[in-house]
Amino acid sequence: MGLQTAKWPSHGTFVLKFWLIMSLGLYSHVSKLLACPSVCRCDRNFVYCNERSLTSVPLGIPEGVTVLYLHNNQINNAGFPAELHNVQSVHTVYLYGNQLDEFPMNLPKNVRVLHLQENNIQTISRAALAQLLKLEELHLDDNSISTVGVEDGAFREAISLKLLFLSKNHLSSVPVGLPVDLQELRVDENRIAVISDMAFQNLTSLERLIVDGNLLTNKGIADGTFSHLTKLKEFSIVRNSLSHPPPDLPGTHLIRLYLQDNQINHIPLTAFANLRKLERLDISNNQLRMLTQGVFDHLSNLKQLTARNNPWFCDCSIKWVTEWLKYIPSSLNVRGFMCQGPEQVRGMAVRELNMNLLSCPTTTPGLPVFTPAPSTVSPTTQSPTVSVPSPSRGSVPPAPAPSKLPTIPDWDGRERATPPISERIQLSIHFVNDTSIQVSWLSLFTVMAYKLTWVKMGHSLVGGIVQERIVSGEKQHLSLVNLEPRSTYRICLVPLDAFNYRTVEDTICSEATTHASYLNNGSNTASSHEQTTSHTMGSPFLLAGLIGGAVIFVLVVLLSVFCWHMHKKGRYTSQKWKYNRGRRKDDYCEAGTKKDNSILEMTETSFQIVSLNNDQLLKGDFRLQPIYTPNGGINYTDCHIPNNMRYCNSSVPDLEHCHT
């Protein structure tokens, strides 16, 4: 018994401790639930006090809360109790859309993410940010912060700040004294016109800089301003007033550069020389008419280049861009190079530009500078094509009769043609009809192949308008078909050697205008072909007329059938209405007096039953019932005839009647 008595106290102590622990845990849980402010809603570690028209932060924010939602209220700077600063568990606070005019004090000391956008904050003090030593992300967008409203060195007090957003404020310059560990800075949509060389001096960790939508010019940016940003990966300076890209851009890590919507009209050759890791470049919506040759040579890692909406002038100075675009690697995506001038190539892609369409003076070593004079062909001055035998390698072919070349005496007294450079290729054009031209040529040197190009003039040129054909060197003529009547075409002939290229000096171009109606009286074939072409051109209109007439005929037939059907239906309805009306018990005889629904008193000695519908027989049977006359006689005639068309006469005298 003594041993058993000794064990009971130990067991009771264990049970007591167990119940005590359970009670404390339950109390702690209940106390947390009861600690939630009455005007808020608590869900685990989140407290929702947003959109409740609060003018101050509610008291009693429990410990353990990590995210505090206070946005879209009417909280002012006096609405932050001192006890809020001691809630250590809160790391994210949403205070956007309130009525703050200063950076608030007494925020939770360990807050890391703070949203203060869409307030009316005008001043930022060092004391306010000195309380937030762990702040990493600060959103101050869409406030009224000015440069003078930021105390010197205020942002430097937030020693842990990594992301600073100051978009849509009233800054006239970039604040000086930013935290050295800052990684992203947004000062877009402000009034910044000046960036001093000290603004980014210590920001060696900055990776993303956005200064879009400001008043920056090249004069307002100090020399070497961006050279300190050695880790910068993205730089956007869109919607400013730059005339050329900012100098001294850091090229160690820069990947994305956005320069669109400025006034850039010139890009220096060395502007992108150090940007060897650049992958994306946007120069759209500027005033660029040309580019310095080799400006993109150092961009070995470029993946995307956008150059839309620039007034590119496609003369000889842009020829290098055309060649560069043809040989860029497939990994590089280039968009936006479209010619805006001169008029003959407006709207044409620079990549597809044919230099033969332009008058480009070229210089050849040992030869004077010249410009081949294009022979403008008129339909009234063209001569028929001259057949010339193919030239052989050992002899100089004779010149065509219409244009004889100058000659000089040879060593044996014979004369040989020695044409100037501009006349080493003879080009002639013969009009077959209004949609076909035959081009003939004669070369005074050996040619492996020819490239003949033609394009319609006077219209905006897009891809596919310039047509070309490669022909062998033995061929000396080619027919161009499916041309438009009364249109001017520029035709160029380019001789190609074994490597498919020759100097531009041997290229010859000519312009020819097709006519609306050309009839060759001496050639029945051409005339017949022209008539066939005219018939072919008119056949679509004939087919369209036939189809239109057939459609109109079908519509008229359908309308006639519909009207006939409606007329027939209306007639049947009218007959049916008369038939129903004829079955009423008021319409039995020509004369009589209705007594009730079953007796009809006749006042005449005879009566006649007639059909009320002359088109079809009435349905049903009619029987004349016996009539008791005053003298006691019964006289009736059964008119039970299906068609009800016989007359029933009665010999009953006209006497006074009485009701029985």
From Swiss-Prot:
This is Leucine-rich repeat transmembrane protein FLRT2. It is a single-pass membrane protein. Residues 36-67 form the LRRNT domain. Coiled coil: none annotated. Self-associates (via leucine-rich repeats), giving rise to homooligomers. Interacts with FGFR1. Interacts with FGFR2. Interacts (via extracellular domain) with ADGRL1/LPHN1. Interacts (via extracellular domain) with ADGRL3 (via olfactomedin-like domain). Interacts (via extracellular domain) with UNC5D (via the first Ig-like domain). Can also interact (via extracellular domain) with UNC5B, but with much lower affinity. Interacts (via extracellular domain) with FN1. GO terms for molecular function: chemorepellent activity; fibroblast growth factor receptor binding. The chain crosses the membrane at residues 541-561. Residues 36-540 are extracellular. Gene3D superfamilies: Immunoglobulins, Ribonuclease Inhibitor. PROSITE patterns: FN3. Residues 372-396 have a biased composition (Low complexity). One of its GO terms (cellular component) is focal adhesion. Residues 419-517 form the Fibronectin type-III domain. InterPro entries: Cys-rich_flank_reg_C, FN3_dom, FN3_sf, Ig-like_fold, Leu-rich_rpt, Leu-rich_rpt_typical-subtyp, LRR_dom_sf, LRRNT. Residues 1-35 form the signal peptide. It is found in: Cell membrane; Endoplasmic reticulum membrane; Synapse, Synaptosome; Cell junction, Focal adhesion. N-glycosylated. Keywords: Cell adhesion, Cell junction, Cell membrane, Developmental protein, Disulfide bond, Endoplasmic reticulum, Extracellular matrix, Glycoprotein, Leucine-rich repeat, Membrane, Microsome, Repeat, Secreted, Signal, Synapse, Synaptosome, Transmembrane, Transmembrane helix. Detected in brain (at protein level). Residues 562-660 are cytoplasmic. Residues 338-361 form the LRRCT domain. Functions in cell-cell adhesion, cell migration and axon guidance. Mediates cell-cell adhesion via its interactions with ADGRL3 and probably also other latrophilins that are expressed at the surface of adjacent cells. May play a role in the migration of cortical neurons during brain development via its interaction with UNC5D. Mediates axon growth cone collapse and plays a repulsive role in neuron guidance via its interaction with UNC5D, and possibly also other UNC-5 family members. Plays a role in fibroblast growth factor-mediated signaling cascades. GO terms for biological process: axon guidance; basement membrane organization; cell adhesion involved in heart morphogenesis; fibroblast growth factor receptor signaling pathway; heart morphogenesis; positive regulation of synapse assembly; regulation of neuron migration; regulation of postsynapse assembly. Disulfide bonds join 36-42, 40-49, 314-339, 316-360. It comes from Rattus norvegicus. Residues 372-413 are annotated as: Disordered. LRR repeats lie at residues 62-87, 88-108, 109-131, 132-157, 159-181, 183-202, 203-228, 229-251, 252-274, 275-298.
